[in-house]
Curated annotation (Swiss-Prot):
Belongs to the complex I subunit 5 family. One of its GO terms (molecular function) is NADH dehydrogenase (ubiquinone) activity. Coiled coil: none annotated. This is NADH-ubiquinone oxidoreductase chain 5. It is found in: Mitochondrion inner membrane. Core subunit of the mitochondrial membrane respiratory chain NADH dehydrogenase (Complex I) which catalyzes electron transfer from NADH through the respiratory chain, using ubiquinone as an electron acceptor. Essential for the catalytic activity and assembly of complex I. It is a multi-pass membrane protein.
Amino acid sequence: MNMFPSLMLTSLLMLTLPIITTTINTHKNSTYPYYVKNIISYAFITSLIPTMMFIHSGQEMIISNWHWMTIQTLKLSLSFKLDYFSMIFVPVALFVTWSIMEFSMWYMHSDPHITQFFKYLLMFLITMMILVTANNLFQLFIGWEGVGIMSFLLISWWYGRTDANTAALQAILYNRIGDIGFIMSMAWFLFNTNSWDLQQIFSLNYNHTDLPLMGLLLAATGKSAQFGLHPWLPSAMEGPTPVSALLHSSTMVVAGVFLLIRFHPLMENNKTVQTFTLCLGAITTLFTAICALTQNDIKKIIAFSTSSQLGLMIVTIGINQPYLAFLHICTHAFFKAMLFMCSGSIIHNLNDEQDIRKMGGLFKAMPFTSTSLIIGSLALTGMPFLTGFYSKDLIIETANTSYTNAWALLITLIATSLTAAYSTRMIFFTLLGQPRSLTLITINENNPLLMNSIKRLLIGSIFAGFFISNNIYPTTIPKTTMPHYLKLTALAVTILGFMMALELSLATYNLKLKHPSSPLKFSNLLGYFPTIFHRLPPLMGLSTSQKSASLLLDLIWLEKILPKSISQFQVKTSTLVSNQKGLIKLYFLSFLVTLTLSLLLLMPHG
């Protein structure tokens, strides 16, 4: 059984080789990206061996411990937990990153710092692997903060642009709010259980776990961009497209969902936290789907679709189905990375044009990218027998047969319908109709680096869901019966979304532009959320700070307490001590009045 951790550790160590070898300069800048890509492909093949063996062995988990240090009564160890979640996730993350690395070699070929870019992407992947294999909170926190700082460095890659720097700061600040919840939970577990090992935390199973679980939910809200802490996710599109693809598919944004899956043994009996989780996910998936409907930036549409799918995963955890949430994480990684790569191909060929209103007619000019974009969008909507269907259909069916909050489940169904609507709108504006781009643009998608990377993810977007869902626990699922209308709900709402979007697009294609309506403004301006929360609190905070500083420091301390108090004290003491009051004018006036009256009285009357 030692073979499982040994092989997984081998694949992890293989990933560190390119970072270690850069200190010796064994590879030139031109060959380094190829070296990194090959290492990741070898690590993927290596990780498949223990994964296959683990699935067929029927084991529940394998834990490897190496004692690190003891702080009084707290024992810290390097502990790796190889269970179903980590054993499946690692090959998926490696496969997707392999394709993204190959795509980056085409997309970033003219970047002068491409070696550093590949190092950052590799560190991003390594920190995510540390996070998913961690068996204690301290190790998990290292991976958690690692993906956070790497996202900051990668989003601000083009640091010459103000928008990129602002977006990176926004991402790190929103994640700081989530980290408060994580640290609070770590402190609670340390004081109440005297341990950070997951197994010991779960074995104690306290009844009053509302506070740490709400802290973990806050952490997941920040990292997985749930409603309230979501604005950083669309802003993160300021980074290069390979960063967007990696960030949204198999690394940072799913870390929050993965954290909740890890702590599900504590959540499953806590109805309060489950209700909060369900409602938060439902609001997120609907709100971000509404925002995606009117966006014109192709990358922002896909970004909002990510946030909507993350909301769906949170809903799944809220209805007590962590395995289905994990299945959706794995299936979502394939088609979401492919959608970003297709958008990157379109943007690159159209001279960095991201507005879908300035595209159109690309189906003939870019047939391979167009086909991949359509298949990816269909997989996203849950079209039968594509990868997304195997997870999304199961989630909708489970939600329909659960006895929890009906309003939250209805909202989720509406969001599922809107997914089809904004996907259809994106395809309609980007690929169909007449070309609206500049006529001088030369389009060429026949680059093997681009085509091979998208091809791999295209195969994954068609077949991966079938293979992963066949190996999900429990492997022997009892046959359930449900009415046909419940079984067909997911497909029905998806088709409804397709039809609605197509009809509206065709009906409004030749209409003149009118003044935008209130619902359009609400959707296009992201529910006024960034405007209110990015302008109002800083303004109020600055004005309050300014007033308090001027009142407390200037008026009270520097004026009233020190100078004026001393002068007033001296005036009062001088008036008490001195005989003269110093009223010269009054003295002269009284003298004049007295003199006048005396003269009037003493003058002889004629």
